[in-house]
Amino acid sequence: MLQDWCRRMGVNAERSLLILDIPDDCEEHEFQEAVRAALSPLGRYRVLIKVFRKELGARAALVEFAEGLNQSLIPRQIAGKGGPWKVISLPQALDAEFQDIPSFPAQPQGQAVARGAGEAGAAGEAGSVGEAGGVNEERSAGEDEAGGIGEAGGVGEAGAAGEAGAAGEAGAAGEAGGAGEAGGAGEAGGAGEEGGTGEEGGAGEAGGAGEEGGEDEAGAAGEAVGAGVVEAWTQSWRQTLRPLVKTMAYRELRPFSGREQPGCVEESFESWLEDAKDMLQLWCHASERERRRRLLDSLDGLALDIVSGLLEEDPDFSAQDCLTALGQVFRSRDTWMTSRMKFLTCTQGPQEGLFAFVVRLEGLLQKAVEKGAVHPAMANHLRLRQVLSRARPSEALQDTLRRMQLERRPPDFLRLLRLIRDMEAWAASLARSQQGVAWAAAPVESEDPAAAQASPAQGDASEADPGAEDADEAASTTKEAARVAPATGEDENAPAGLEGLGQGRSPDAPGGLPARMGSAVDMAPGGPSWEPEGLVQVGGQEAEEPPQEGLKPILEESENEDEDGAGEAGKPKSPPGK
């Protein structure tokens, strides 16, 4: 059970423990506290899985340790809720698997064979000893006979000479015969000894062979039965854990149809394909048929029709091959011509900012470059052309971009974005500065009592309309100059002087706006005099300088003429300077 769980989870069984008999109503914090108290001495660990086993009527948990386990420290039980929880480690699991194996008669058979071999060896030894004893007895008998013959020879020597010669010959013959008999006996004894030794060795070899054969038969039988038990356990737990693994690994794939509808919020095919590849990795334990079924459940529309047609032609078509076919269909739909047309027809939306439009245009440009519809060397030129023709840049930015286009130095993507940011910031600061100048208008001095009485009312009106204030101020100044100026030729100088100061023409007058626009364009970002604060300072100086400097000489001359006309009426007027 432990090995099967570890094989399914892909962990090392030697560094894992299996905890059984965990109550179903045991809370997570109670389980963690009990496991921590019992397993913390073994080292760092993590709980891989904790599931309810219907056949056990309780939960089971698989725990993996970071390092090898010390078998002497592994607890057999864990004190927890509902009673002790059983702990199973790898050696205990192997013992539990083999403890129910019945004892076979192979070992007694081996002992009987060994016992028979021992008896045969003992009999061989006894036979060899008996044969050796017989040989010794024969040898002693031969010696006795030889002694007797020798004695007879001695008697013959003591007798007559003839008899002595005959007896000597007989003694010699007897000695020779005795010697021959003794030699034969010795040879027989040696042969007996060798035979005994051979029988003993044969019996010993037979006994050893019997013992080895018995042990081999017993080991083979034990391995066969043990393998059968392990295989039975493996199949049982595989059938039990298969639904669990399917439940853990099965996660629905996001839907994909391949439709292109304006209101459709479906994700792109590239992102869906990456997610599908990851899901196939999680479905590795499922069968190929189940993987195809799950893939078909996530498809709809054109994508479903394509995969269904492929499976009708080849029922053994794998899920990976289905993804490959979908990639060939949906990735190749944007040809180089389609990508180029999408880029060339991209237009700035009504509520879309210029910065956002340029970013969206860049995405289409990069796709066109990938498809080969646009050469990379022409990317900056085409980007600038599309911004000028399909976007709505400000006049200052448009002049700057057109000058870059004529000079054949189009900006790249990042430089164009910086230029747009700088232009937007400059336009905002210019608008704030112009609004501040219109509110802080300089007061106008006037000798007309009616104009002086009307000045508070004009001030209130100027607060309501800053443009009307400038127009009223210019009109009052023109009236005063026309009243005090000489009748001959001086009326033409006053408007000219006012126009030179920039106060004689109102902002709403014809010709005023182009002059202001021209100055703004010259000082735009990227222009010849790019200083955003320059126009603000010039405008402030024009607003702060009172329009009375050009009128002072005219007023003084008119006052002198009035005094001379009153004091010297009838006298000719002397030329000035005398």
Curated annotation (Swiss-Prot):
Pfam families: PNMA (PF14893), PNMA_N (PF20846)
Composition-biased stretches (Low complexity): 112-129, 160-173, 449-461
Region (Disordered), start-end ranges: 106-221, 441-578
Biased composition (Gly residues): 147-159, 174-211
Bias (Acidic residues): 462-473, 556-566
InterPro entries in the cross-refs: PNMA, PNMA_C, PNMA_N
PANTHER family found in the cross-reference section: PARANEOPLASTIC ANTIGEN, PARANEOPLASTIC ANTIGEN MA6F
Record's protein name: Paraneoplastic antigen Ma6F
UniProt organism field: Homo sapiens (Human)
